[in-house]
Amino acid sequence: MTYEYDIIVVGGGHAGCEAAAAAAKLGAQTLLITMDMGKFANMSCNPAVGGVAKGQIVREIDALGGRTARITDRTTLQFRMLNRSKGAAMWSPRAQCDKGRFSAEWRHELENTQNLYIWQDTAAELLFDTAGERPRVTGVRTYMGVEFTARAVILTAGTFLDGMMYCGEAHAPGGRAGDPASTGITASLAAMGFETGRMKTGTPARLDARTIDFEALEPQYGDENPSKLSFSTDTQSVKHQSPCFLVYTSPEVHATLRTGFDRSPLFNGTIHGIGPRYCPSIEDKLRTFADKEQHQLFLEPEGDNTNEYYLNGFSSSLPWEVQYEALHRIRGLEDVHIFRPGYAIEYDYFPPTQLRHTLETKLVDGLYFAGQVNGTTGYEEAAAQGLLAGINAHRKRVGESAIVLQRDEAYIGVLIDDLVTKGVDEPYRMFTSRAEYRILLRQDNADLRLTPLGHEIGLISEKDFANFERKKSCVESLISFARRTSVRAGEIDDYLKSVDSEPMKQGRKLYDILLRNEIAFAGLSRVLPKLAQLIEEKGMTTEAIEEAEIQIKYNGYIQREKFIAEKLHRLENIAIPADFDYHSMQSLTIEARQKLTRIRPTTIGQASRIPGVSPADVNVLLVKFGR
Protein backbone atom coordinates (compact mmCIF):
# COMPACT_ATOMS: atom_id res chain seq x y z
CA MET A 1 0.00 0.00 0.00
CA THR A 2 1.18 3.54 -0.79
CA TYR A 3 1.63 5.96 2.09
CA GLU A 4 2.82 8.90 -0.01
CA TYR A 5 0.37 11.06 -1.96
CA ASP A 6 0.34 14.42 -3.66
CA ILE A 7 -2.75 15.65 -1.81
CA ILE A 8 -4.63 14.34 1.23
CA VAL A 9 -8.24 15.39 1.87
CA VAL A 10 -9.48 14.96 5.45
CA GLY A 11 -13.24 14.49 5.59
CA GLY A 12 -15.77 13.02 3.15
CA GLY A 13 -18.51 15.64 3.33
CA HIS A 14 -19.59 17.96 0.54
CA ALA A 15 -16.36 19.99 0.65
CA GLY A 16 -14.14 16.92 0.86
CA CYS A 17 -15.86 15.11 -2.00
CA GLU A 18 -15.51 18.07 -4.38
CA ALA A 19 -11.92 18.71 -3.28
CA ALA A 20 -10.83 15.10 -3.74
CA ALA A 21 -12.63 14.66 -7.07
CA ALA A 22 -11.16 17.86 -8.51
CA ALA A 23 -7.59 17.22 -7.37
CA ALA A 24 -7.62 13.64 -8.64
CA LYS A 25 -9.21 14.53 -11.97
CA LEU A 26 -6.49 17.13 -12.51
CA GLY A 27 -3.84 14.44 -12.06
CA ALA A 28 -2.86 14.58 -8.40
CA GLN A 29 -2.45 11.29 -6.55
CA THR A 30 -5.13 11.99 -3.97
CA LEU A 31 -6.05 10.25 -0.72
CA LEU A 32 -9.47 10.89 0.84
CA ILE A 33 -9.65 9.98 4.54
CA THR A 34 -13.18 9.49 5.85
CA MET A 35 -14.71 7.90 8.93
CA ASP A 36 -17.44 6.10 6.98
CA MET A 37 -17.43 5.28 3.27
CA GLY A 38 -21.20 4.83 3.44
CA LYS A 39 -21.77 8.50 4.24
CA PHE A 40 -20.01 10.47 1.52
CA ALA A 41 -21.60 13.93 1.19
CA ASN A 42 -24.17 12.90 3.76
CA MET A 43 -27.12 15.28 4.00
CA SER A 44 -26.89 15.69 7.76
CA CYS A 45 -29.55 18.38 7.76
CA ASN A 46 -32.22 19.04 5.11
CA PRO A 47 -32.37 16.72 2.07
CA ALA A 48 -32.12 19.47 -0.54
CA VAL A 49 -29.59 21.25 -2.73
CA GLY A 50 -29.83 24.84 -3.93
CA GLY A 51 -32.16 27.62 -2.91
CA VAL A 52 -31.75 31.40 -2.87
CA ALA A 53 -28.12 32.21 -3.86
CA LYS A 54 -27.18 28.61 -3.06
CA GLY A 55 -28.62 27.43 -6.37
CA GLN A 56 -26.42 29.94 -8.16
CA ILE A 57 -23.40 28.51 -6.34
CA VAL A 58 -24.27 24.96 -7.39
CA ARG A 59 -24.56 26.03 -11.03
CA GLU A 60 -21.16 27.74 -10.73
CA ILE A 61 -19.66 24.56 -9.28
CA ASP A 62 -21.08 22.71 -12.28
CA ALA A 63 -19.80 25.30 -14.76
CA LEU A 64 -16.28 24.89 -13.35
CA GLY A 65 -16.41 21.10 -13.60
CA GLY A 66 -17.55 20.10 -10.11
CA ARG A 67 -19.92 17.19 -9.56
CA THR A 68 -22.58 18.37 -7.09
CA ALA A 69 -25.15 19.49 -9.68
CA ARG A 70 -24.93 16.27 -11.69
CA ILE A 71 -25.38 14.12 -8.60
CA THR A 72 -28.29 16.32 -7.53
CA ASP A 73 -29.99 15.86 -10.91
CA ARG A 74 -29.67 12.08 -10.64
CA THR A 75 -31.31 12.05 -7.21
CA THR A 76 -33.92 14.83 -7.46
CA LEU A 77 -37.37 14.20 -5.98
CA GLN A 78 -38.73 17.69 -6.69
CA PHE A 79 -37.45 20.75 -8.54
CA ARG A 80 -38.49 24.38 -8.09
CA MET A 81 -37.13 27.60 -9.53
CA LEU A 82 -37.54 29.97 -6.59
CA ASN A 83 -38.34 33.68 -7.01
CA ARG A 84 -39.59 33.16 -10.55
CA SER A 85 -41.99 36.09 -10.09
CA LYS A 86 -39.03 38.42 -9.49
CA GLY A 87 -36.27 39.55 -11.82
CA ALA A 88 -33.90 37.02 -13.39
CA ALA A 89 -31.08 37.97 -11.00
CA MET A 90 -33.15 36.50 -8.16
CA TRP A 91 -34.13 33.19 -9.81
CA SER A 92 -32.69 30.38 -7.72
CA PRO A 93 -32.94 26.65 -8.52
CA ARG A 94 -33.65 24.23 -5.66
CA ALA A 95 -33.93 20.44 -5.72
CA GLN A 96 -35.38 18.16 -3.07
CA CYS A 97 -33.17 15.04 -3.09
CA ASP A 98 -33.17 11.39 -2.11
CA LYS A 99 -30.46 11.63 0.55
CA GLY A 100 -29.55 7.94 0.45
CA ARG A 101 -29.13 7.90 -3.31
CA PHE A 102 -27.25 11.21 -3.19
CA SER A 103 -24.60 9.74 -0.91
CA ALA A 104 -24.48 6.49 -2.92
CA GLU A 105 -24.02 8.42 -6.18
CA TRP A 106 -21.12 10.35 -4.64
CA ARG A 107 -19.53 7.08 -3.53
CA HIS A 108 -19.84 5.68 -7.04
CA GLU A 109 -18.34 8.89 -8.44
CA LEU A 110 -15.36 8.84 -6.09
CA GLU A 111 -14.63 5.12 -6.39
CA ASN A 112 -14.50 5.48 -10.16
CA THR A 113 -12.28 8.58 -10.27
CA GLN A 114 -8.78 7.88 -11.53
CA ASN A 115 -5.94 8.87 -9.15
CA LEU A 116 -8.31 8.93 -6.16
CA TYR A 117 -7.81 6.55 -3.24
CA ILE A 118 -9.94 6.22 -0.11
CA TRP A 119 -8.93 5.26 3.43
CA GLN A 120 -11.62 4.66 6.07
CA ASP A 121 -10.22 5.92 9.35
CA THR A 122 -10.20 9.05 11.51
CA ALA A 123 -7.52 11.70 11.17
CA ALA A 124 -5.98 12.26 14.60
CA GLU A 125 -3.19 14.73 13.90
CA LEU A 126 -1.76 16.87 11.14
CA LEU A 127 2.00 16.59 10.63
CA PHE A 128 4.29 19.56 10.01
CA ASP A 129 7.86 20.40 9.11
CA THR A 130 8.97 23.47 11.07
CA ALA A 131 12.67 23.33 10.18
CA GLY A 132 12.48 25.71 7.22
CA GLU A 133 11.83 29.42 6.97
CA ARG A 134 8.07 28.76 6.96
CA PRO A 135 6.29 25.76 8.45
CA ARG A 136 4.70 23.39 5.96
CA VAL A 137 2.28 20.51 6.27
CA THR A 138 3.74 17.07 5.56
CA GLY A 139 0.88 14.67 6.17
CA VAL A 140 -1.68 13.11 8.48
CA ARG A 141 -1.57 10.57 11.32
CA THR A 142 -4.76 8.55 11.82
CA TYR A 143 -6.34 6.95 14.88
CA MET A 144 -5.03 3.58 13.69
CA GLY A 145 -1.52 4.99 13.82
CA VAL A 146 -1.00 5.13 10.05
CA GLU A 147 1.07 8.06 8.78
CA PHE A 148 0.35 9.35 5.28
CA THR A 149 2.56 12.01 3.71
CA ALA A 150 1.65 14.60 1.08
CA ARG A 151 2.65 17.92 -0.44
CA ALA A 152 -0.73 19.38 0.51
CA VAL A 153 -3.51 18.61 2.98
CA ILE A 154 -7.09 19.91 2.63
CA LEU A 155 -9.01 19.93 5.92
CA THR A 156 -12.77 19.52 5.40
CA ALA A 157 -13.82 18.15 8.78
CA GLY A 158 -17.27 19.76 8.96
CA THR A 159 -18.82 19.69 12.44
CA PHE A 160 -16.62 16.84 13.66
CA LEU A 161 -13.74 18.72 15.34
CA ASP A 162 -14.35 18.25 19.07
CA GLY A 163 -18.06 18.07 18.25
CA MET A 164 -20.52 17.90 21.15
CA MET A 165 -24.21 17.05 20.63
CA TYR A 166 -27.02 18.33 22.87
CA CYS A 167 -30.65 17.33 23.37
CA GLY A 168 -32.02 18.99 26.47
CA GLU A 169 -29.81 18.12 29.43
CA ALA A 170 -28.35 15.12 27.63
CA HIS A 171 -25.10 15.58 25.77
CA ALA A 172 -22.47 13.40 24.14
CA PRO A 173 -19.41 13.88 21.94
CA GLY A 174 -20.06 13.37 18.24
CA GLY A 175 -19.77 14.84 14.78
CA ARG A 176 -23.44 14.10 14.10
CA ALA A 177 -25.94 11.53 15.39
CA GLY A 178 -24.35 8.09 15.14
CA ASP A 179 -20.84 9.32 14.35
CA PRO A 180 -17.94 10.03 16.75
CA ALA A 181 -16.24 13.38 17.11
CA SER A 182 -12.71 13.95 15.86
CA THR A 183 -10.24 14.97 18.54
CA GLY A 184 -6.62 15.95 18.14
CA ILE A 185 -6.66 18.02 14.96
CA THR A 186 -7.69 21.27 16.63
CA ALA A 187 -4.97 20.82 19.24
CA SER A 188 -2.31 20.20 16.60
CA LEU A 189 -3.37 23.35 14.73
CA ALA A 190 -3.59 25.48 17.87
CA ALA A 191 -0.04 24.41 18.68
CA MET A 192 1.00 25.86 15.31
CA GLY A 193 -0.52 29.21 16.26
CA PHE A 194 -3.98 28.96 14.64
CA GLU A 195 -6.85 30.86 16.25
CA THR A 196 -9.87 28.67 16.92
CA GLY A 197 -13.49 29.24 17.92
CA ARG A 198 -16.75 27.40 18.53
CA MET A 199 -19.92 27.47 16.47
CA LYS A 200 -23.24 25.72 16.77
CA THR A 201 -25.80 24.27 14.40
CA GLY A 202 -28.81 22.03 14.78
CA THR A 203 -31.30 19.79 13.06
CA PRO A 204 -35.00 18.94 13.54
CA ALA A 205 -36.74 15.69 14.39
CA ARG A 206 -37.27 13.08 11.67
CA LEU A 207 -40.82 11.78 11.36
CA ASP A 208 -42.47 8.53 10.22
CA ALA A 209 -44.69 9.11 7.16
CA ARG A 210 -46.98 6.23 8.16
CA THR A 211 -48.12 8.26 11.18
CA ILE A 212 -48.69 11.60 9.41
CA ASP A 213 -52.18 12.72 8.34
CA PHE A 214 -51.25 14.14 4.94
CA GLU A 215 -54.91 14.88 4.16
CA ALA A 216 -54.78 17.63 6.79
CA LEU A 217 -51.70 19.22 5.23
CA GLU A 218 -51.22 21.63 2.34
CA PRO A 219 -49.16 20.05 -0.47
CA GLN A 220 -46.34 22.00 -2.13
CA TYR A 221 -45.67 20.72 -5.64
CA GLY A 222 -42.65 21.13 -7.86
CA ASP A 223 -42.56 23.14 -11.09
CA GLU A 224 -44.90 21.98 -13.83
CA ASN A 225 -42.02 21.97 -16.31
CA PRO A 226 -39.01 21.29 -14.08
CA SER A 227 -35.51 22.28 -15.08
CA LYS A 228 -32.33 20.89 -13.54
CA LEU A 229 -29.13 22.10 -11.90
CA SER A 230 -26.42 20.80 -14.23
CA PHE A 231 -25.66 22.32 -17.62
CA SER A 232 -24.51 18.89 -18.80
CA THR A 233 -26.57 16.95 -21.31
CA ASP A 234 -25.67 13.79 -19.36
CA THR A 235 -28.43 14.45 -16.82
CA GLN A 236 -32.17 14.88 -17.28
CA SER A 237 -34.80 16.84 -15.37
CA VAL A 238 -36.87 14.89 -12.85
CA LYS A 239 -39.81 12.98 -14.39
CA HIS A 240 -41.89 12.03 -11.34
CA GLN A 241 -41.93 14.56 -8.52
CA SER A 242 -42.79 14.07 -4.85
CA PRO A 243 -44.67 16.83 -3.01
CA CYS A 244 -43.57 18.59 0.15
CA PHE A 245 -46.18 19.70 2.70
CA LEU A 246 -46.82 22.97 4.47
CA VAL A 247 -47.70 22.94 8.19
CA TYR A 248 -47.92 25.56 10.93
CA THR A 249 -47.23 25.82 14.63
CA SER A 250 -49.82 27.36 16.97
CA PRO A 251 -50.01 29.10 20.36
CA GLU A 252 -50.61 25.67 21.93
CA VAL A 253 -47.45 24.31 20.30
CA HIS A 254 -45.49 27.35 21.48
CA ALA A 255 -46.74 26.97 25.06
CA THR A 256 -45.60 23.35 25.09
CA LEU A 257 -42.16 24.24 23.75
CA ARG A 258 -41.72 26.97 26.38
CA THR A 259 -42.09 24.40 29.17
CA GLY A 260 -38.63 23.15 28.22
CA PHE A 261 -36.82 26.48 27.97
CA ASP A 262 -35.23 26.07 31.42
CA ARG A 263 -33.59 22.85 30.17
CA SER A 264 -32.54 24.27 26.80
CA PRO A 265 -28.74 24.17 26.32
CA LEU A 266 -29.14 27.30 24.19
CA PHE A 267 -30.70 29.28 27.02
CA ASN A 268 -29.01 27.93 30.16
CA GLY A 269 -25.46 28.67 29.06
CA THR A 270 -24.43 25.11 28.20
CA ILE A 271 -23.78 25.96 24.54
CA HIS A 272 -21.39 28.84 23.97
CA GLY A 273 -20.98 28.52 20.19
CA ILE A 274 -22.79 30.98 17.91
CA GLY A 275 -25.62 29.50 15.84
CA PRO A 276 -26.77 30.36 12.30
CA ARG A 277 -28.75 33.61 12.26
CA TYR A 278 -30.77 32.64 9.18
CA CYS A 279 -31.59 29.09 10.24
CA PRO A 280 -32.64 29.53 13.89
CA SER A 281 -34.01 26.80 16.11
CA ILE A 282 -37.71 26.80 16.91
CA GLU A 283 -36.92 27.94 20.47
CA ASP A 284 -34.86 30.82 19.07
CA LYS A 285 -37.83 31.84 16.93
CA LEU A 286 -40.15 31.86 19.94
CA ARG A 287 -37.73 34.07 21.86
CA THR A 288 -37.00 36.44 18.96
CA PHE A 289 -40.55 36.65 17.60
CA ALA A 290 -42.52 36.28 20.81
CA ASP A 291 -45.56 38.07 19.34
CA LYS A 292 -46.02 35.62 16.44
CA GLU A 293 -48.82 33.11 16.91
CA GLN A 294 -47.58 30.67 14.28
CA HIS A 295 -44.48 29.70 12.33
CA GLN A 296 -44.38 28.05 8.93
CA LEU A 297 -42.87 24.56 8.65
CA PHE A 298 -42.26 22.26 5.68
CA LEU A 299 -42.43 18.48 5.67
CA GLU A 300 -39.84 17.22 3.17
CA PRO A 301 -39.39 13.60 2.01
CA GLU A 302 -35.92 12.14 2.61
CA GLY A 303 -36.13 9.58 -0.18
CA ASP A 304 -38.21 7.35 -2.44
CA ASN A 305 -37.54 4.21 -0.43
CA THR A 306 -37.98 5.50 3.10
CA ASN A 307 -40.83 6.72 5.29
CA GLU A 308 -38.57 9.35 6.84
CA TYR A 309 -39.63 13.00 6.62
CA TYR A 310 -37.62 16.08 7.57
CA LEU A 311 -39.51 18.88 9.37
CA ASN A 312 -37.88 22.01 7.96
CA GLY A 313 -38.14 24.95 10.36
CA PHE A 314 -38.35 22.90 13.56
CA SER A 315 -34.67 22.57 14.43
CA SER A 316 -34.40 22.12 18.20
CA SER A 317 -32.20 21.05 21.09
CA LEU A 318 -35.02 21.05 23.64
CA PRO A 319 -35.52 17.84 25.66
CA TRP A 320 -36.81 15.09 23.40
CA GLU A 321 -40.02 14.67 25.39
CA VAL A 322 -40.82 18.39 24.97
CA GLN A 323 -40.25 18.09 21.21
CA TYR A 324 -42.49 15.00 21.21
CA GLU A 325 -45.36 16.73 23.03
CA ALA A 326 -45.12 19.85 20.86
CA LEU A 327 -45.10 17.90 17.60
CA HIS A 328 -48.29 16.09 18.63
CA ARG A 329 -50.03 19.44 18.90
CA ILE A 330 -49.38 20.30 15.25
CA ARG A 331 -52.29 19.73 12.87
CA GLY A 332 -51.67 16.55 10.88
CA LEU A 333 -49.03 15.29 13.32
CA GLU A 334 -51.34 14.37 16.21
CA ASP A 335 -50.30 10.69 16.05
CA VAL A 336 -46.82 11.10 14.63
CA HIS A 337 -44.02 8.71 15.49
CA ILE A 338 -40.55 10.26 15.77
CA PHE A 339 -37.61 8.34 14.34
CA ARG A 340 -35.18 10.59 16.21
CA PRO A 341 -35.47 13.97 17.92
CA GLY A 342 -33.77 17.18 16.92
CA TYR A 343 -30.46 18.11 18.52
CA ALA A 344 -27.80 20.81 18.47
CA ILE A 345 -24.10 20.32 17.83
CA GLU A 346 -21.24 22.57 18.89
CA TYR A 347 -17.93 22.28 17.05
CA ASP A 348 -14.55 23.91 16.39
CA TYR A 349 -13.86 26.24 13.49
CA PHE A 350 -10.94 28.42 12.42
CA PRO A 351 -11.58 32.13 11.69
CA PRO A 352 -11.13 32.32 7.91
CA THR A 353 -9.14 35.56 7.96
CA GLN A 354 -6.24 33.13 8.54
CA LEU A 355 -6.59 32.05 4.89
CA ARG A 356 -5.45 33.36 1.54
CA HIS A 357 -7.98 33.68 -1.29
CA THR A 358 -6.70 30.32 -2.55
CA LEU A 359 -7.97 28.81 0.76
CA GLU A 360 -4.39 27.97 1.72
CA THR A 361 -3.56 29.01 5.27
CA LYS A 362 -1.24 31.95 5.81
CA LEU A 363 0.56 30.22 8.69
CA VAL A 364 1.39 26.85 7.10
CA ASP A 365 2.34 26.18 3.49
CA GLY A 366 0.38 23.47 1.73
CA LEU A 367 -2.47 23.41 4.27
CA TYR A 368 -5.95 24.30 2.98
CA PHE A 369 -9.26 24.67 4.84
CA ALA A 370 -12.70 24.26 3.23
CA GLY A 371 -16.28 24.05 4.46
CA GLN A 372 -17.67 24.43 7.96
CA VAL A 373 -14.18 24.57 9.49
CA ASN A 374 -14.10 28.06 7.92
CA GLY A 375 -17.26 29.13 9.71
CA THR A 376 -19.72 28.60 6.86
CA THR A 377 -23.00 26.72 6.86
CA GLY A 378 -24.63 24.84 3.99
CA TYR A 379 -23.76 22.01 1.61
CA GLU A 380 -23.40 24.39 -1.33
CA GLU A 381 -21.00 26.80 0.36
CA ALA A 382 -18.90 23.84 1.52
CA ALA A 383 -18.82 22.17 -1.90
CA ALA A 384 -17.72 25.41 -3.56
CA GLN A 385 -14.85 25.87 -1.12
CA GLY A 386 -13.81 22.24 -1.53
CA LEU A 387 -13.72 22.56 -5.31
CA LEU A 388 -11.51 25.66 -5.22
CA ALA A 389 -9.24 24.19 -2.54
CA GLY A 390 -8.77 21.03 -4.60
CA ILE A 391 -8.01 23.02 -7.74
CA ASN A 392 -5.55 25.34 -6.01
CA ALA A 393 -3.76 22.62 -4.05
CA HIS A 394 -3.07 20.82 -7.33
CA ARG A 395 -2.06 23.95 -9.23
CA LYS A 396 0.42 25.00 -6.55
CA ARG A 397 1.91 21.50 -6.61
CA VAL A 398 2.61 21.70 -10.36
CA GLY A 399 3.69 25.35 -10.36
CA GLU A 400 0.60 26.84 -12.01
CA SER A 401 -1.06 30.10 -11.02
CA ALA A 402 -3.85 29.97 -8.45
CA ILE A 403 -7.51 30.32 -9.37
CA VAL A 404 -9.09 33.23 -7.49
CA LEU A 405 -12.59 34.20 -8.60
CA GLN A 406 -13.47 37.89 -8.34
CA ARG A 407 -16.66 39.27 -6.83
CA ASP A 408 -18.03 40.17 -10.28
CA GLU A 409 -17.22 36.69 -11.66
CA ALA A 410 -19.03 34.36 -9.29
CA TYR A 411 -20.95 33.98 -6.05
CA ILE A 412 -18.09 31.65 -5.12
CA GLY A 413 -15.80 34.67 -5.44
CA VAL A 414 -18.07 36.68 -3.14
CA LEU A 415 -18.15 33.80 -0.65
CA ILE A 416 -14.39 33.34 -0.42
CA ASP A 417 -13.64 37.08 -0.42
CA ASP A 418 -16.14 37.65 2.39
CA LEU A 419 -14.59 34.86 4.46
CA VAL A 420 -10.98 35.88 3.93
CA THR A 421 -11.48 39.65 4.07
CA LYS A 422 -14.31 40.17 6.55
CA GLY A 423 -14.18 37.01 8.62
CA VAL A 424 -17.20 35.57 10.41
CA ASP A 425 -18.73 35.93 13.86
CA GLU A 426 -21.62 33.54 13.12
CA PRO A 427 -22.14 30.69 10.63
CA TYR A 428 -21.95 32.28 7.17
CA ARG A 429 -24.50 31.48 4.49
CA MET A 430 -24.81 33.04 1.06
CA PHE A 431 -27.60 35.41 0.03
CA THR A 432 -28.13 37.31 -3.19
CA SER A 433 -27.88 40.50 -1.12
CA ARG A 434 -24.21 39.76 -0.37
CA ALA A 435 -23.32 40.15 -4.06
CA GLU A 436 -22.84 43.66 -5.47
CA TYR A 437 -23.12 42.35 -9.03
CA ARG A 438 -26.04 39.95 -8.82
CA ILE A 439 -27.35 40.94 -12.26
CA LEU A 440 -24.05 39.66 -13.66
CA LEU A 441 -24.07 36.58 -11.39
CA ARG A 442 -27.32 34.96 -12.48
CA GLN A 443 -27.96 31.22 -12.31
CA ASP A 444 -28.71 31.06 -16.05
CA ASN A 445 -25.32 32.39 -17.17
CA ALA A 446 -23.00 30.53 -14.79
CA ASP A 447 -21.71 28.49 -17.73
CA LEU A 448 -21.04 31.57 -19.86
CA ARG A 449 -19.10 33.07 -16.97
CA LEU A 450 -17.10 30.06 -15.83
CA THR A 451 -17.09 27.12 -18.24
CA PRO A 452 -14.21 28.50 -20.37
CA LEU A 453 -12.18 28.70 -17.15
CA GLY A 454 -13.24 25.20 -16.12
CA HIS A 455 -12.13 23.92 -19.52
CA GLU A 456 -8.81 25.75 -19.26
CA ILE A 457 -8.23 24.29 -15.78
CA GLY A 458 -8.94 20.80 -17.08
CA LEU A 459 -12.19 19.86 -15.31
CA ILE A 460 -14.60 20.37 -18.23
CA SER A 461 -14.60 17.54 -20.76
CA GLU A 462 -14.35 18.18 -24.50
CA LYS A 463 -17.90 16.88 -24.91
CA ASP A 464 -19.30 19.30 -22.32
CA PHE A 465 -17.27 22.17 -23.74
CA ALA A 466 -18.60 21.47 -27.24
CA ASN A 467 -22.16 21.57 -25.85
CA PHE A 468 -21.33 24.85 -24.13
CA GLU A 469 -20.00 26.33 -27.38
CA ARG A 470 -23.21 25.28 -29.17
CA LYS A 471 -25.35 26.99 -26.54
CA LYS A 472 -23.22 30.12 -26.67
CA SER A 473 -23.51 30.19 -30.46
CA CYS A 474 -27.30 29.83 -30.25
CA VAL A 475 -27.57 32.70 -27.77
CA GLU A 476 -25.43 34.96 -29.96
CA SER A 477 -27.37 34.00 -33.11
CA LEU A 478 -30.71 34.72 -31.48
CA ILE A 479 -29.62 38.13 -30.18
CA SER A 480 -28.13 39.01 -33.58
CA PHE A 481 -31.35 37.92 -35.31
CA ALA A 482 -33.38 40.13 -32.95
CA ARG A 483 -31.15 43.14 -33.65
CA ARG A 484 -31.41 42.92 -37.44
CA THR A 485 -35.01 41.73 -37.84
CA SER A 486 -37.77 44.29 -38.33
CA VAL A 487 -41.41 43.62 -37.44
CA ARG A 488 -44.12 45.52 -39.31
CA ALA A 489 -46.92 47.33 -37.51
CA GLY A 490 -49.89 44.98 -37.16
CA GLU A 491 -47.80 41.87 -37.93
CA ILE A 492 -47.96 40.52 -34.38
CA ASP A 493 -50.99 42.38 -32.99
CA ASP A 494 -52.84 39.16 -32.10
CA TYR A 495 -49.89 38.00 -30.00
CA LEU A 496 -49.49 41.41 -28.36
CA LYS A 497 -53.16 41.42 -27.46
CA SER A 498 -52.91 37.92 -25.96
CA VAL A 499 -50.24 39.10 -23.49
CA ASP A 500 -51.93 42.46 -22.74
CA SER A 501 -49.27 44.45 -24.58
CA GLU A 502 -49.87 47.66 -26.49
CA PRO A 503 -50.12 47.21 -30.30
CA MET A 504 -47.33 48.76 -32.38
CA LYS A 505 -48.21 51.92 -34.30
CA GLN A 506 -45.12 51.59 -36.49
CA GLY A 507 -42.56 48.96 -37.39
CA ARG A 508 -39.84 48.16 -34.86
CA LYS A 509 -36.82 45.94 -34.46
CA LEU A 510 -37.56 42.62 -32.79
CA TYR A 511 -34.88 43.46 -30.20
CA ASP A 512 -36.80 46.57 -29.10
CA ILE A 513 -40.07 44.66 -28.86
CA LEU A 514 -38.42 42.11 -26.56
CA LEU A 515 -37.56 44.89 -24.12
CA ARG A 516 -41.20 44.76 -23.01
CA ASN A 517 -41.48 42.55 -19.90
CA GLU A 518 -44.46 40.59 -21.17
CA ILE A 519 -42.92 39.67 -24.54
CA ALA A 520 -41.11 36.34 -24.93
CA PHE A 521 -39.36 34.49 -27.75
CA ALA A 522 -41.63 31.50 -27.15
CA GLY A 523 -44.74 33.49 -28.02
CA LEU A 524 -43.11 35.41 -30.87
CA SER A 525 -41.95 32.19 -32.52
CA ARG A 526 -45.60 31.23 -33.03
CA VAL A 527 -46.29 34.35 -35.11
CA LEU A 528 -42.90 34.97 -36.75
CA PRO A 529 -42.06 32.05 -39.08
CA LYS A 530 -38.45 33.17 -39.62
CA LEU A 531 -37.82 33.14 -35.88
CA ALA A 532 -39.37 29.69 -35.55
CA GLN A 533 -37.23 28.48 -38.47
CA LEU A 534 -34.02 29.78 -36.85
CA ILE A 535 -34.84 28.08 -33.54
CA GLU A 536 -35.63 24.79 -35.28
CA GLU A 537 -32.64 24.82 -37.64
CA LYS A 538 -30.16 25.41 -34.82
CA GLY A 539 -31.92 23.05 -32.43
CA MET A 540 -32.05 25.73 -29.76
CA THR A 541 -32.79 24.56 -26.25
CA THR A 542 -35.19 26.28 -23.88
CA GLU A 543 -32.16 27.31 -21.80
CA ALA A 544 -30.42 29.00 -24.75
CA ILE A 545 -33.60 30.85 -25.74
CA GLU A 546 -34.18 32.01 -22.17
CA GLU A 547 -30.55 33.15 -21.86
CA ALA A 548 -30.80 35.27 -25.02
CA GLU A 549 -34.05 36.79 -23.80
CA ILE A 550 -32.57 37.71 -20.40
CA GLN A 551 -29.51 39.30 -22.02
CA ILE A 552 -31.77 41.45 -24.18
CA LYS A 553 -34.16 42.52 -21.43
CA TYR A 554 -31.43 43.25 -18.87
CA ASN A 555 -28.78 44.62 -21.21
CA GLY A 556 -28.84 48.14 -19.75
CA TYR A 557 -28.45 46.88 -16.19
CA ILE A 558 -25.79 44.37 -17.24
CA GLN A 559 -23.68 47.04 -18.94
CA ARG A 560 -23.98 49.35 -15.94
CA GLU A 561 -22.77 46.65 -13.53
CA LYS A 562 -19.90 45.77 -15.85
CA PHE A 563 -18.85 49.43 -15.92
CA ILE A 564 -18.89 49.67 -12.12
CA ALA A 565 -16.97 46.39 -11.80
CA GLU A 566 -14.30 47.55 -14.25
CA LYS A 567 -13.79 50.76 -12.26
CA LEU A 568 -13.34 48.83 -9.02
CA HIS A 569 -10.98 46.35 -10.69
CA ARG A 570 -8.38 49.12 -10.73
CA LEU A 571 -8.14 48.83 -6.95
CA GLU A 572 -7.71 45.06 -7.27
CA ASN A 573 -4.69 45.64 -9.50
CA ILE A 574 -2.82 47.74 -6.92
CA ALA A 575 -0.83 45.26 -4.83
CA ILE A 576 0.25 45.67 -1.21
CA PRO A 577 3.55 44.01 -0.16
CA ALA A 578 2.92 40.98 2.05
CA ASP A 579 5.29 42.22 4.77
CA PHE A 580 4.21 45.87 4.79
CA ASP A 581 4.27 47.51 8.24
CA TYR A 582 0.90 49.26 8.61
CA HIS A 583 1.82 50.56 12.07
CA SER A 584 4.41 52.78 10.40
CA MET A 585 1.59 54.75 8.73
CA GLN A 586 0.30 57.12 11.40
CA SER A 587 -2.19 58.60 8.92
CA LEU A 588 -4.20 55.37 9.09
CA THR A 589 -6.70 55.05 11.92
CA ILE A 590 -5.70 52.77 14.79
CA GLU A 591 -8.54 50.37 13.91
CA ALA A 592 -7.43 50.24 10.27
CA ARG A 593 -3.82 49.52 11.27
CA GLN A 594 -4.95 46.69 13.53
CA LYS A 595 -7.33 45.15 10.99
CA LEU A 596 -4.88 45.47 8.07
CA THR A 597 -2.07 43.92 10.11
CA ARG A 598 -4.26 40.98 11.15
CA ILE A 599 -5.86 40.23 7.77
CA ARG A 600 -2.93 41.18 5.51
CA PRO A 601 -4.86 42.12 2.32
CA THR A 602 -3.00 41.52 -0.92
CA THR A 603 -4.57 44.44 -2.83
CA ILE A 604 -6.11 47.82 -2.05
CA GLY A 605 -9.40 46.44 -3.36
CA GLN A 606 -9.39 43.75 -0.68
CA ALA A 607 -8.32 46.28 1.96
CA SER A 608 -11.28 48.50 1.06
CA ARG A 609 -13.72 45.69 1.98
CA ILE A 610 -12.34 45.07 5.46
CA PRO A 611 -14.78 46.25 8.15
CA GLY A 612 -13.16 49.15 9.98
CA VAL A 613 -11.12 50.37 7.02
CA SER A 614 -12.70 53.69 5.99
CA PRO A 615 -12.65 55.42 2.58
CA ALA A 616 -10.13 57.86 4.10
CA ASP A 617 -7.88 54.92 5.01
CA VAL A 618 -8.18 53.62 1.45
CA ASN A 619 -7.08 57.01 0.12
CA VAL A 620 -4.01 56.88 2.38
CA LEU A 621 -3.14 53.47 0.91
CA LEU A 622 -3.69 54.80 -2.61
CA VAL A 623 -1.26 57.64 -1.98
CA LYS A 624 1.30 55.17 -0.63
CA PHE A 625 1.02 52.48 -3.30
CA GLY A 626 0.02 54.56 -6.32
CA ARG A 627 -3.23 55.45 -8.03
Q: Model-predicted segments: where are they?
A:
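A glycine-rich dinucleotide-binding beta-alpha-beta segment and adjacent secondary-structure elements
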Residues: 310-376, 404-417, 541-595, 600
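An anion/pyrophosphate-binding glycine-rich loop and adjacent beta-alpha core
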Residues: 36-37, 186-324, 421-494, 498-506, ...
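Core beta-strand elements of the Rossmann-like FAD/NAD(P) dinucleotide-binding domain
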Residues: 3-5, 143-152
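Extended, charge-enriched "interface" segments that sit outside catalytic cores
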Residues: 434, 440, 451-619, 623-627
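Conserved beta-strand-loop-beta-strand element in the redox core of flavoprotein oxidoreductases
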Residues: 127-147
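Internal hydrophobic alpha-helix adjacent to the cofactor/substrate pocket in enzyme cavities
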Residues: 382-403
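Conserved N-terminal/central alpha/beta ligand/cofactor-binding core
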Residues: 21-125, 144, 156-176, 180, ...
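Beta1/beta-strand and adjacent pyrophosphate-binding region of the FAD-binding site
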Residues: 2-15
